């Protein structure tokens, strides 16, 4: 017990190094798909940090993630959304299993997110509306738009009727600035 403070310093030092290693590995994992994200962002005129934040929230960068309603891959796409992308991209050989491919999934997800954003161009900031549509569907978003929430994104976020969708939108909007530096 004479050197308890030395053991304490050693333990603190090792835990600090573990935290640094964990942060480095996480950053490396989060950057793994940056090239694909940039390609999708350029193709569909989206901010790459937004796409990356959606991937972070939807799948935590797990290409094999599957959702409760059958959503697949990095951006957690449904078959219907993916087939819509494939039709628009004139891909005749598309199959839902292709959604496990990071490039295919990210391109399809970016297409769908850009489509959602285009539906709200009259708003001061269409991104929260697009994210809510991506998560809960456009019909839900149209129900939540009321009064000043029709065009004011801050008011709209407060009017989102599903707590999980409100948290989803807020989490992505908080995370997006953290990913900005990855694309500068």
Question: What are the residue ranges of the model-derived segments?
Answer:
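Cell-wall polysaccharide-cleaving catalytic domain and substrate-binding groove, primarily
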Residues: 56-81, 137
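Substrate-binding/active-site groove segments that recognize
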Residues: 69-92, 107-112, 151
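Catalytic and substrate-binding regions of cell-wall glycan-acting enzymes that process beta-1,4-linked
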Residues: 129-184
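Second-shell loop/turn segments in exported
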Residues: 23-27, 37-40, 63-72, 91-103, ...
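Alpha-helical scaffolds flanking conserved acidic
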Residues: 47-52, 125-132
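N-terminal Sec-pathway targeting helices
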Residues: 1-20
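Export/targeting segments at the very N-terminus of extracytoplasmic proteins
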Residues: 14-64, 86, 91, 103, ...
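Short glycine/serine- and small hydrophobic-enriched flexible loop segments
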Residues: 56, 111-118
């Amino acid at each position: 017990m004479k050197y308890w403070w030395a053991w304490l310093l050693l333990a603190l030092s090792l835990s600090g190094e573990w935290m640094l290693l964990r942060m480095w590995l996480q950053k490396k994992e989060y950057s793994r798909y940056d090239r694909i994200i940039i390609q999708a962002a350029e193709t569909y005129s989206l901010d790459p940090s937004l796409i990356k934040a959606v991937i972070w929230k939807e799948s935590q960068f797990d290409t094999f993630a599957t959702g409760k309603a059958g959503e697949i891959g990095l951006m957690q796409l449904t078959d219907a959304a993916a087939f819509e992308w494939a039709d628009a991209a004139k891909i005749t050989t598309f199959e839902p299993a292709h959604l496990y491919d990071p490039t295919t999934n990210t391109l399809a997800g970016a297409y769908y997110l850009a489509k959602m954003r285009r539906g709200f161009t009259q708003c001061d900031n269409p991104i929260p509306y697009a994210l809510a549509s991506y998560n809960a569907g456009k019909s839900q978003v149209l129900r939540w738009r009321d009064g000043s929430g029709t065009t004011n994104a801050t008011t709209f976020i407060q009017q989102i009727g599903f707590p999980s969708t409100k948290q989803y939108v807020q989490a992505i909007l908080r995370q997006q600035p953290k990913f900005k530096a990855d694309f500068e």
